[in-house]
Amino acid sequence: MFACVALAQKDKPWTEWSRKDVEKTLNDSAWGQTQMEGGAGAQSSNTSAVTQVAAQRSSDRELNSRQGESGEAKPVAYVKYHVRFLSAKPVRAAFARQVLLAKEQPDEALTTQLQGFIDRDFSEYIVISVGVEVGDQKMAGPIMAAFNGANSETLAKTVYLERKDGKKLFLMEYRAPVGDGMGAKFIFKRVLDGQPFLSENDNVRFVAQLNEKMKLDARYKLSNMLYDGKLEY
């Protein structure tokens, strides 16, 4: 399945990706996975970065109130954590395309600016971003508090990348969500002891324990992470 996604991306430039291409890359691909907790939230297709959850709260509360009055189903209590390799070019391309798709008219200047973001040099770092989607906005508060209250020091020993041989690479820097729509960011050194921490033959696990109740655990196979003939992670 991942190979089909990569092939579809290779066949057309990122500026021509569909919404389906974007969502697949960000949420169900070699570079982006979804960890779900709670009830079935499969019917939701709108992913909200953790920075966007609070902004939606007021309008969703009003909508939910109207739904309750009309006898329609109440929100399902689920959380989806979208864990992505932001340092991988296809993920940045998907975020860039998401921005363009939100525009009514093509914007050449914005496209050029976004291309610069896609081509940014990540040769020294591995960056994992985590976006959040909730089925019930009442759940947003504690989640926001966990991400916004964390810092590099508190997460230094509870966030790491782990290779298939058991070797761990602990967090270098944490950045809480800001208004860029990409969520929280976990930054790691790409090189350890003079060698890249990961190679094409590796499997890697991302683990982040933010508090007693919130733990992220996502696994990736690097041999699937080829984009335009290059290993992207």
Where are these regions (language model features)?
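Sec/Tat signal peptide C-region and signal peptidase I cleavage site
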Residues: 2-8
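PEST-like low-complexity, intrinsically disordered acidic/proline/serine-rich tracts
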Residues: 9-233
